[in-house]
Amino acid sequence: MEARAILRHTPTSPRKMRLVADLVRGKQVDAAKAMLAHSTKHAARTVLQTLSSAVANYSQANPEKRLDESELIVKRIYVDQGVTLKRILPAPMGRAYRVRKRANHLTIIVDEANPTDEQN
């Protein structure tokens, strides 16, 4: 049984967030949390909080299972582009430059590392 956490409208460029998401894709949750905690990227903190939320959602959905974080893996993690806010920056000689403030949507899905067959 998998669980997911979705964070929408994060004020970070999707390209920068994907750099961090690629670090933890397919890793065990405890190893992924250790990597994110020691990462210098600003987006790592956001991914760490969302990953913790996904683990909490898994434990809420499966109260009978007492799994350690080393038994969970980051099954899927992906970053979609959100709304782009367009702002104006005054430029020389009466011109104006357009500034695009990008946002993204982060989705993390966690699951057991070796799910057992319960269809007996």
Swiss-Prot record:
GO terms for cellular component: cytosolic large ribosomal subunit. It holds the Pfam family Ribosomal_L22. CDD domains: Ribosomal_L22. Keywords: Ribonucleoprotein, Ribosomal protein, RNA-binding, rRNA-binding. Signal peptide: none annotated. SUPFAM superfamilies: Ribosomal protein L22. InterPro entries: Ribosomal_uL22, Ribosomal_uL22_bac/chlpt-type, Ribosomal_uL22_bac/org-type, Ribosomal_uL22_sf. GO terms for biological process: translation. It comes from the Bacteria. One of its GO terms (molecular function) is rRNA binding. The keyword rRNA-binding applies. Belongs to the universal ribosomal protein uL22 family. PANTHER family: CHLOROPLAST 50S RIBOSOMAL PROTEIN L22-RELATED, LARGE RIBOSOMAL SUBUNIT PROTEIN UL22M. Part of the 50S ribosomal subunit. This protein binds specifically to 23S rRNA; its binding is stimulated by other ribosomal proteins, e.g. L4, L17, and L20. It is important during the early stages of 50S assembly. It makes multiple contacts with different domains of the 23S rRNA in the assembled 50S subunit and ribosome. The globular domain of the protein is located near the polypeptide exit tunnel on the outside of the subunit, while an extended beta-hairpin is found that lines the wall of the exit tunnel in the center of the 70S ribosome. This is Large ribosomal subunit protein uL22. The lineage of its organism: Bacteria, Pseudomonadati, Chlorobiota, Chlorobiia, Chlorobiales.
